[in-house]
């Protein structure tokens, strides 16, 4: 609590030049442990995009084409992705089937990237520019990491890093299975609380690792929880002094050009990666409270 209060009090000192890019993973839907390609996918997409349209903010969405392409067909998936494009999203590649690079043969993983851009390219009418690693796993060895980076460059891709990592998928799964409105409200309230705590944490950690606050990139998922919470999340970002920018604009920050050599069987924020690459110990972000983690473990076991 003292940590949060400190940064909320200290907020005005750093608020003037803050920027954040909103990036959304697992399109057309993901993060809440339900059928990603349900018959209501069109309605869900409209609900999810409504607060983003209303706020008029830029955002990016990273697509897993595979499952929904198989269940819905190319034409229906294209219609869904066209809604995202028409709402202003920059559509990126999150692979076809969301494999873990750390335990997938390279050639198979690379093929999955190419397979994951097929419908997206039809919708955008242009090459797909950005790639987001599934699970944020970038390789267990430096050789694996560099091989993927080289392959992506050769195919015209820019890696889409994230600096503000979030456990939104945990809250989203609980929210999708809440037994009543009271439980849903409790989950929503704690989700919004921890999201602001995470912003405060990564703002401070950026200053410690990089010397100043980077133009942040926040990761969330295309879930019903975020469809319901986006107005509050956007308001929180603005209250903290953020200007919401495109991913392209955020990546103009020269700090993103700093090399990082972190390799492990973990998917973590790039702020942690840069720190570890400098030999700094990782200071982990706040966890959800015990009741959230225990409920999630019970649900997925």
Task: List each language-model region with its residue ranges.
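Catalytic domains of cell-wall/extracellular-matrix polysaccharide-remodeling enzymes
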Residues: 69-76, 97-243, 249
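C-terminal domain-boundary segment and adjacent tail
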Residues: 54-56, 161, 222-301
């Amino acid at each position: 609590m003292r940590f949060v209060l400190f940064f909320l009090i200290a907020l005005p000192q750093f608020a003037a030049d803050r920027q954040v890019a909103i990036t959304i993973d697992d399109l057309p839907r993901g993060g809440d442990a339900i059928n990603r390609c349900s018959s209501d996918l069109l309605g869900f997409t409209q609900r999810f995009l409504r607060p983003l349209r209303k706020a008029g903010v830029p955002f990016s969405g990273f697509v897993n084409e595979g499952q929904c392409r198989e269940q819905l067909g190319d034409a229906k998936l294209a219609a869904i992705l066209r809604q995202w494009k028409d709402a202003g999203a920059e559509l990126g590649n999150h692979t076809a089937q969301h494999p873990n690079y750390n335990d997938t043969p390279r050639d198979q993983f690379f093929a999955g990237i190419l397979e994951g851009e097929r419908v997206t390219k039809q919708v955008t009418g242009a090459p797909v520019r950005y790639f987001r690693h599934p699970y944020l796993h970038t390789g267990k060895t430096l050789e694996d990491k560099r091989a993927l980076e080289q392959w992506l460059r050769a195919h015209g891709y820019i890696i889409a890093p994230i600096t503000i990592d979030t456990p939104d998928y945990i809250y989203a799964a609980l929210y999708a299975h809440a037994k009543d409105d009271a439980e849903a409200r409790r989950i929503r309230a704690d989700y919004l609380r921890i999201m602001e705590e995470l912003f405060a944490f990564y703002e401070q950690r950026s200053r410690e690792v990089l010397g100043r606050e980077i133009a942040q990139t926040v990761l969330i998922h295309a879930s019903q929880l975020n469809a319901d919470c986006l107005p509050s999340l956007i308001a929180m970002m603005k209250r903290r002094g953020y200007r919401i920018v495109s991913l392209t604009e955020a990546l103009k920050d020269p700090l993103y050009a700093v090399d990082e050599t972190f390799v492990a069987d973990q998917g973590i924020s790039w702020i942690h990666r840069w720190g570890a690459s400098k030999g700094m110990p990782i200071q982990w972000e706040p966890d959800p409270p015990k009741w959230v983690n225990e409920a999630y473990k019970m649900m997925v076991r």
